[in-house]
């Protein structure tokens, strides 16, 4: 008899935990979707652009915002400015001049992330030009 009662209590506790966990996961998914929608609205990006940025951030391990801060460049990205800032920061953080490999790698990763963004923007502008040509032909 005591085993039966203990089994009922254990089953009830397991059921309650399962329901609570299911509810928590469902709430977390809903909140994540809402946060993604708010982020897209705040940045003015489409969901696909947001996903592309997230993929690039994950692939390179650094966000675009952090990269811009490290290299001290502003958002109308200019390849020449990025290259100039990169070369300067990479040179002054040389180990022979008292810098560290860690700082050099941060500068390198920042430039790599900005280059990825510039490539993506160039590809997007080329696609827009092609689309405009097709629309003008019709």
Curated annotation (Swiss-Prot):
Keyword Calcium part of the UniProt annotation: no
The scientific name of the source species is Caenorhabditis briggsae
What's the record's remark on domains?
The J-like region, although related to the J domain does not have co-chaperone activity.
GO BP: any one term: protein import into mitochondrial matrix
Question: What protein name does the entry list?
Answer: Mitochondrial import inner membrane translocase subunit tim-16
| Its membrane topology | Peripheral membrane protein
Entry function: Regulates ATP-dependent protein translocation into the mitochondrial matrix.
Look up the domain of life of the source. Eukaryota
- Mind listing the UniProt keywords for this protein, alphabetically? Membrane, Mitochondrion, Mitochondrion inner membrane, Protein transport, Translocation, Transport
**Entry's localization field:** Mitochondrion inner membrane
Q: Subunit structure of this entry?
A: Probable component of the PAM complex at least composed of a mitochondrial HSP70 protein, GrpE, tim-44, tim-16 and tim-14. Associates with the TIM23 complex.
InterPro entries, from UniProt? Answer: J_dom_sf (IPR036869), Tim16 (IPR005341)
User: Can you tell me which family this protein belongs to?
Assistant: Belongs to the TIM16/PAM16 family.
Compositionally biased, Polar residues: which spans?
A: 44-56
Q: Which region ranges are annotated with the description J-like? A: 66-119
